[in-house]
Amino acid sequence: MRRAFTFAVLAALLLAGGAQSLTALEWGGTFDNTTTPPHYLGFQQEDTLALWLEAEFNPRMSLTVQGSYTYNLDRPYLFDVDILRFQGRFPLGDSSQMELSLGRFRVADFSKLLFDDNLDGAQLVWRSPRANLALNLGYLGLELQPVSTVSMTWGDLNNASIWAPPRLIEMLQVELPELFGRHSLSAALVAQQDLRSEDLQPEGPSAEVIGLGGRLSTEYLGVALRGPLAAALYYDLFGYLGTGRTLSYIDGAYSYEWVLSGLVGGGLRYFRGEWLSSSAELRLLLATGDEDYTDLFIEGNRDGLATVFSTISQPELALLFSPRLGNLMLAEASYSLKPAAVLQTLLKATFFLRPTLGPVSDARVDPASSSPYLGTEVDVAARLRLFSDLGLAFTAGVFLPGGAFRASDQETDFGGRAELSFSF
């Protein structure tokens, strides 16, 4: 089977005119299973089979392709192209290199909170001992909607198309490694444009229409600093300033109002390799909110300047309670260790609050509540790497809702997840 597949790939490359310069070819696959025990929606299971191919035409040119099939009860047939990346590497002197990538590939900002998803487009990277620069330009609307994590407006949420929201992304990131001592500085400029032109709520006087929404284009400027404070003690700090324009409903009329928002975070990490690779970490995160927003949260501005921070993709903050990163403050304490070479364990507690008494994206929060406390989640996880090509992971969590939740929704929440990964 493996020989037949390799022969078919070589034949395809020959027909394309590229086999004469092919110097290396590798292929393989992965099978991933995610199982969620009975919860709100009952027993859930998802299986993904992926096949990948890496072809090197010469030391400077390569092609990476990965396709996958995912099965679950909601979507029994989901075929996707995860990666389709043509990459060229061009040395610039003895210590620097330029890299150009075209196609579909994963892109993330330095925090992995603002944007972390696939991008169809181009990436230009310059690497040197003193500085690293990455410029990304791409389109999000060619990714399948079920696998996309991009969701910013009512139009994104109510998208009946199989395709992800039509948005254009530009991202420029600069890293200065070991700028002073062993401390590194990073900066990022990110912008996204909403290209949707139809089925939008027009500006002007109107009765309020729920669920239609408008366009949301945003820009972000971010900086980050990380490095050691002492032996085995490390820190990282970052912040984003966000702006843009969002559809707002004010005094019986729709209009686009300016956004001015912020996201700040940081952490301390203490690591001792000789103590079973023990790592203790404390992290803080704050995303601005707006008391003038309605309890629907999405495009909820009702009074002038909008100050809710909006991420482009939606990160997972915890196993059970993971609202949108807007009007949210959290403190996270975690401890991990490796009691065996094949076993990694983790204990994590996350405390959620809201910096303003405005709404958050979870509908269980009472808009009339004066409590800033959203709740506490405790998660435990174990990861087993039994063989180099076989891994298992088990996660369990409990969430205790806080005083900001409706009285009818303050029951303790339990949940778990089991994951299996096999490579071949």
Give the positions of each predicted feature.
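Bacterial N-terminal signal peptides
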Residues: 7-17
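Outer-membrane beta-barrel "beta-signal"
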Residues: 412-424
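Positively charged n-region of N-terminal signal peptides that target proteins for export
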Residues: 1-4
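Signature for the C-terminal beta-barrel architecture of outer-membrane proteins
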Residues: 26, 60, 92-99, 109, ...
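C-terminal structural cap/anchor segments
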Residues: 279-281, 286-373, 377
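Hydrophobic, well-ordered secondary-structure elements that form the walls
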Residues: 282, 335, 380-382, 393-394, ...
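Transmembrane beta-strand segments of Gram-negative outer membrane beta-barrel proteins
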Residues: 20-47, 55, 59-65, 100, ...
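Membrane helical hairpin/interfacial module
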Residues: 64-87
